[in-house]
């Protein structure tokens, strides 16, 4: 027993910050983001790239790599099966990726519970919004009249949310996919090419405060566990359900916003380097300089720990089979997740 304890102590010494400094010194850590340039995921990743290195022994440099496409699936697959597993690559992937796995999304080659989650910047309700000049003024109007809603790919939460609302609540969103990034989709909304989209509320605050100031958009519904203080009169989609089954399906669909903007390391990352990355991620989110820069960019930070985010993702993955199956069938009938 004493020999075993000694081995554990020696292993701890090998995994010490001093040993890690030998590895990280003069290295560059890549942050892969599953979105294009200009969105809130990209902005937050670039903010981390400027600060996180200060909390890693050896003070490595950081670079952001945008890898959009496939409704965020391309980057997530890359992190699972292709990226280096040496502690020099981390990622922020869209919070719909665990849900996408549960629902059997097209092209998925990852298992969310096999990633090493570092934490998250905090929960963020999504909203369904329309241009203020659209004839649709309430969610009930969207149940009576068709409205063009822009999105990226079939596996994205930007598609899943309105698709689920169409099938469960009877809304008539005509989902137009194919936009390469959130910013490209915003331009389409500005031009009137589409009249509606799903969006993280904090992204609107950080990227388009002018939309709020000039009342360019109107909010029809929000997706999350509780109403935002800023939107007390905008209903949650779960509040619109009329049966327990509908409520269960919409609760599952509403799970991604609670994950916020999660960060991960790929399976196989060495435990000592993973511990350093998790500690650095946590320390960065408490750092006054980081928080000051985040506030200047209108980026909210309400940290979720590695342990918490891991449990939240496991809860999604282990959704009751009947609810997962009904949701999967429902979305397939609606045109999503064809394989």
Language model regions located:
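An extracytoplasmic/periplasmic, membrane-proximal ligand-sensing/linker region
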Residues: 25-27, 214-216, 269-339
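A ligand-binding cleft/hinge motif common to bilobed small-molecule-binding domains
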Residues: 95-107, 159-168, 196-240
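Ligand-binding clamshell of periplasmic/extracellular solute-binding protein-like
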Residues: 48, 70-73, 87-99, 120-122, ...
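Extracytoplasmic "Venus flytrap"
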Residues: 31-46, 68-71, 150-157
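Sec-dependent N-terminal signal peptides
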Residues: 5-14
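Short beta-strand and adjacent tight-turn residues that come in two discontinuous sequence segments
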Residues: 92-93, 152, 178-180, 198-200, ...
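Hinge/capping helix and adjacent helix->loop/strand transition within the periplasmic-binding protein
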Residues: 23, 29, 54-59, 78-89, ...
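N-terminal signal peptide c-region/cleavage motif recognized by signal peptidases
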Residues: 15-19
């Amino acid at each position: 027993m004493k020999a075993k304890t000694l081995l554990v102590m020696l292993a701890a010494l090998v995994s010490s910050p001093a040993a890690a400094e030998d590895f990280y010194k003069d290295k560059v850590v890549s942050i892969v983001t599953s979105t294009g340039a200009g969105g809130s995921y990209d902005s937050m990743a670039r903010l981390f790239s400027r600060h996180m290195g200060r909390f890693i022994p050896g003070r490595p440099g950081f670079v952001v790599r945008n890898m959009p496409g496939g409704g965020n699936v391309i980057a997530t697959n890359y992190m699972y099966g292709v990226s280096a597993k040496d502690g020099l690559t981390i990622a922020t992937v869209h919070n719909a990726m665990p849900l996408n796995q549960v629902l059997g999304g097209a092209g998925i080659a990852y298992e969310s519970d096999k990633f090493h989650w570092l934490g998250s910047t905090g929960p963020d309700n999504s909203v369904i919004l329309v241009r203020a000049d659209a004839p649709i003024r309430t969610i009930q109007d969207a149940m009576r009249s068709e409205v063009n809603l822009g999105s990226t790919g079939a596996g994205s939460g930007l598609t899943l949310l309105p698709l689920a609302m169409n099938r469960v609540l009877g809304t008539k969103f005509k989902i137009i996919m194919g936009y390469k990034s959130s910013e490209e989709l915003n331009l389409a909304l500005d031009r009137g090419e589409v009249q509606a989209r799903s969006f993280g509320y904090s992204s609107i605050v950080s990227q388009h405060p002018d939309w709020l100031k000039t009342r360019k958009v109107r909010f029809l519904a929000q997706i999350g566990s509780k109403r935002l203080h800023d939107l007390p009169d905008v209903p949650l989609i779960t509040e619109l359900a009329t049966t327990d089954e509908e409520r269960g399906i919409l609760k599952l669909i509403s799970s991604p916003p609670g994950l916020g903007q999660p960060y991960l390391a790929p399976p196989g990352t060495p435990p000592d380097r993973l511990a350093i990355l998790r500690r650095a991620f946590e320390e960065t989110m408490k750092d006054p300089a980081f928080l000051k820069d985040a506030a200047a960019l209108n980026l909210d930070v309400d940290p979720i720990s590695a342990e918490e985010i891991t449990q939240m993702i496991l809860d999604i993955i282990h959704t009751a089979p009947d609810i997962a199956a009904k949701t999967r069938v429902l979305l397939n009938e609606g045109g999503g997740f064809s394989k």
